[in-house]
């Protein structure tokens, strides 16, 4: 317990908050190249393989990013745009690829939640 005099001389030091998405450098998105695209099994109660891309960002950080939605065309040397947002059942995956931007195509024929998957508006008949 500090004395009043010690507090006057030095004050209290605020705790520093850790940045969960340090690789983004305070940016909303970053662009990168995929050196590897693979699948990874999730944590315990879940079992479906998660599509994961290793991405080398434009600031030379190497990260793992989740590719959302069913099916994708991403392969080696694809350019992708990355946003924050972790995958709860995949340890170490703290980013998402944005569908419908750069080389990663959106999902065709998707009708609901289209903006999250880069899907075109369907033609009304």
UniProtKB/Swiss-Prot annotation:
InterPro entries: NA-bd_OB-fold, Ribosomal_uS12, Ribosomal_uS12_bac. It is found in: Mitochondrion. GO terms for molecular function: structural constituent of ribosome. Keywords: Mitochondrion, Ribonucleoprotein, Ribosomal protein. GO terms for biological process: translation. The keyword Ribonucleoprotein applies. GO terms for cellular component: mitochondrion; small ribosomal subunit. Residues 10-23 have a biased composition (Basic and acidic residues). The keyword Mitochondrion applies. It comes from the Eukaryota. CDD domains: Ribosomal_S12. Pfam families: Ribosom_S12_S23. Signal peptide: none annotated. Residues 1-51 are annotated as: Disordered. NCBIfam families: rpsL_bact. PANTHER family: 30S RIBOSOMAL PROTEIN S12 FAMILY MEMBER. Protein S12 is involved in the translation initiation step. Belongs to the universal ribosomal protein uS12 family. This is Small ribosomal subunit protein uS12m. It comes from Nicotiana sylvestris.
